[in-house]
Amino acid sequence: MMKGQIAGLMKQAQQMQENMKKAQEQLALIEVEGVSGAGLVKVVMTCKNDVKRVSIDPSLLAEGEDKDLLEDLIAAAFNDAVRKAEATTQEKMGSLTSGLGGMAGMLPPGFKLPF
């Protein structure tokens, strides 16, 4: 490889690193909502998996309501939020990995980036 090509790759890697840092900061601000029980339970979390709110419809807290059902609905809403956060993260970060250009061929087969 020529000296200029190496310098170009290093500059490209540094720019990508800066872009990834900015994207990760943005992901910490993006909120997704997981829902279960036709909207009776909602979980709002960031794409960095920080739970911000849990909302439970008052009808689920009424006397005689099934505790196990409520627990299942909370778990389902949480899992829904996690899936949405992962999908959003992949979408946002995917544009960065497509910018690898010539560096993509340097990664080992099967190598996965940490996001």
Curated annotation (Swiss-Prot):
InterPro entries: YbaB-like_sf, YbaB/EbfC. The keyword Transferase does not apply. It is found in: Cytoplasm, Nucleoid. Keywords: Cytoplasm, DNA-binding. GO terms for cellular component: bacterial nucleoid; cytosol. GO terms for molecular function: DNA binding. The keyword Transmembrane helix does not apply. PANTHER family: NUCLEOID-ASSOCIATED PROTEIN YBAB (PTHR33449:SF1). Binds to DNA and alters its conformation. May be involved in regulation of gene expression, nucleoid organization and DNA protection. HAMAP family: DNA_YbaB_EbfC. Belongs to the YbaB/EbfC family. Homodimer. This is Nucleoid-associated protein Rpic_1036. It comes from Ralstonia pickettii (strain 12J).
